[in-house]
Amino acid sequence: MSGMRVYLGADHAGYELKQRIIEHLKQTGHEPIDCGALRYDADDDYPAFCIAAATRTVADPGSLGIVLGGSGNGEQIAANKVPGARCALAWSVQTAALAREHNNAQLIGIGGRMHTVAEALAIVDAFVTTPWSKAQRHQRRIDILAEYERTHEAPPVPGAPA
């Protein structure tokens, strides 16, 4: 999987790492698109940047997205508010790869204060190079979540009384 379009959004806590990731993606043949912050501002708030990156990723099938902040937690939550977005918090190479392979995640959240640059770039590389497995059991789970997102009706709990 090469030449991926990757939308990135970060607040002040992820700004410097986002800049490094953008350069790394360019050097490895990908097309990074910066959804902000476009300059460092210690008082900015992550939701706008993460929602912008997630919205653009969902609207561009086949693309991926990365949202960054201090921990990646709030950024992941913000991205997941976008209908159709599947954003996983990636804290290791393995979690980034599994986000793609098992969950067909289009986005990951990375904590800019949680990783060295080398660790973060390894997470990014795992995410952009791991293909979706297309395994039926994983697709079934994605479909259940998509149906809940569409209807707001929770799936039945197996074995629970009616």
Swiss-Prot record:
Sorted UniProt keywords: Carbohydrate metabolism, Isomerase
Binding site for D-ribulose 5-phosphate: 11-12, 70-74, 103, 113, 137, 141
Enzyme active site: 75, 102
Regulation: Weakly inhibited by phosphate and completely inhibited by iodoacetate.
GO BP field: D-allose catabolic process; pentose-phosphate shunt, non-oxidative branch
Reactions listed under catalytic activity: aldehydo-D-ribose 5-phosphate = D-ribulose 5-phosphate
MF annotations from Gene Ontology: ribose-5-phosphate isomerase activity
Leftover remarks: In mycobacterial enzymes, the usual proton acceptor is not a cysteine, but is remplaced by a glutamate.
Family indicated by similarity: Belongs to the LacAB/RpiB family.
Name the record gives this protein: Ribose-5-phosphate isomerase B
Native organism: Mycobacterium tuberculosis (strain ATCC 25618 / H37Rv)
